[in-house]
């Protein structure tokens, strides 16, 4: 076999959402901080294009690059590459990364609990992995500070009129809207329409409401539209379903850890949930994250929470991505039949 490069990948999904992990073949990018390293990857695009574009990837795929941490508290760093963004944090991807590094032995597993500190571009997270029989069975992530920026804001969306929305940050930035009011019940056969409408709402929210992280002015847009059903109690436990539209136009298969964190911040701001109370976030395929508020904090003068996201991930395979020197598409390609135009 002829190849100009070999990238070693562990395939993983967390509650349905693909979050593959690069474990070899890629040098750490330049930058004094993980955020700077992630900005290099975002602007350079070489690695993103190679692993995310067809024929090696697709719009369904997220890929994480393991890097040495910059924060001395952390044992490992990771940079998240989503189809269109290189975000500060991702709940499902942090669960994929934690599972991959424990199940593969990159970090030694301790049963029944393994405690780790990982560094994402958006900050340090604490992980407690529930382990048995050589498998990380459940990953509990103490997420970064999550906060509300707007409650019950008016948003004009062409074809929909005036919507009432919330905006919040849970490791990434969200506009949150009632799905029932839009005529959806959040079923798999609604995914295409949800994705298209979500992109439309996100664009309107960026134009009219905007977002700037109080401690990181580089993150200055709303990334996702989270369409939600009302909170109910199932067997006494607060439960809610959501579908998160991810750029350039797909629906998260998992319950979206950063989305659950943002929703917890909104719920707490409204007095709907207390510290330590369990909330189950459910996805469009009915997978679940178990979440709760660990503590209250403050960030950039804003009241915030530290949420915990709990979910499962599974190894799907091990692969090597290669580039034949005669391949006419070294950066891959995107077609609008599966990769919607932003």
Curated annotation (Swiss-Prot):
Catalytic activity from the UniProt record: trans-3-hydroxy-L-proline = 1-pyrroline-2-carboxylate + H2O
Positions of the catalytic residues: 90 (proton acceptor)
Annotated Gene3D superfamilies: Diaminopimelate Epimerase, Chain A, domain 1
Residues holding substrate: 91-92, 252, 257-258
InterPro entries linked: Pro_racemase_fam
Entries under SUPFAM superfamilies matching the protein: Diaminopimelate epimerase-like
GO molecular function annotation: 4-hydroxyproline epimerase activity; trans-L-3-hydroxyproline dehydratase activity
Annotated keywords: Lyase, Plasmid
EC number, as in UniProt: 4.2.1.77
Keyword flag Cell division: no
Family: Belongs to the proline racemase family.
Role noted for this protein: Catalyzes the dehydration of trans-3-hydroxy-L-proline (t3LHyp) to Delta(1)-pyrroline-2-carboxylate (Pyr2C). Is likely involved in a degradation pathway that converts t3LHyp to L-proline. Displays neither proline racemase activity nor 4-hydroxyproline 2-epimerase activity.
Record's protein name: Trans-3-hydroxy-L-proline dehydratase
Organism this protein belongs to: Allorhizobium ampelinum (strain ATCC BAA-846 / DSM 112012 / S4) (Agrobacterium vitis (strain S4))
């Amino acid at each position: 076999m002829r190849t100009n490069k070999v990238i070693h990948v562990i395939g993983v999904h967390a509650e349905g959402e693909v979050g593959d992990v690069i474990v070899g073949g890629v040098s750490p990018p330049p930058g004094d901080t993980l955020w700077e390293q992630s900005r290099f990857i975002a602007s350079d695009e070489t690695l993103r294009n190679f692993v995310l574009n067809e024929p090696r990837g697709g719009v369904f795929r997220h890929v994480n690059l393991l890097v040495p941490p910059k924060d001395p508290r952390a044992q490992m760093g990771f940079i998240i590459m989503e189809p269109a963004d290189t975000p500060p944090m991702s709940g499902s991807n942090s669960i994929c990364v934690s599972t991959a590094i424990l199940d593969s032995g990159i970090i030694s597993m301790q049963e029944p609990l393994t405690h780790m500190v990982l560094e994402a571009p958006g900050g340090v997270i604490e992980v407690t992995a529930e382990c048995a029989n050589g498998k990380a069975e459940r990953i509990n992530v103490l997420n970064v500070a999550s906060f509300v920026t707007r409650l019950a804001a008016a948003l004009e969306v062409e074809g929909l009129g005036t919507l009432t929305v919330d905006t919040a940050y849970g490791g990434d930035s969200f506009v949150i809207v009632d799905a029932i009011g839009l005529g959806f019940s959040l079923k798999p056969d609604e995914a295409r329409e949800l994705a298209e409408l979500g992109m439309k709402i996100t664009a309107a929210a960026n134009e009219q409401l905007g977002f700037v992280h109080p401690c990181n002015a580089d993150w200055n847009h709303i990334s996702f539209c989270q369409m939600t059903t009302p909170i109910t109690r199932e067997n006494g436990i607060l439960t809610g379903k959501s579908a998160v539209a991810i750029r350039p136009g797909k629906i998260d298969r998992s319950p979206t850890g950063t989305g659950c964190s943002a929703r917890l911040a909104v719920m707490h701001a409204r007095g709907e949930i207390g510290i330590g109370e369990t909330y189950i976030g459910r996805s469009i395929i009915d997978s679940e994250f178990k979440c709760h508020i660990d503590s209250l904090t403050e960030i950039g003068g804003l009241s915030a929470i530290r949420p915990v996201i709990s979910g499962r991930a599974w190894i799907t395979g091990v692969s090597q991505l290669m580039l034949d020197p005669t391949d006419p598409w070294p950066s891959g390609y995107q077609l609008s039949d599966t990769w919607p135009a932003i």
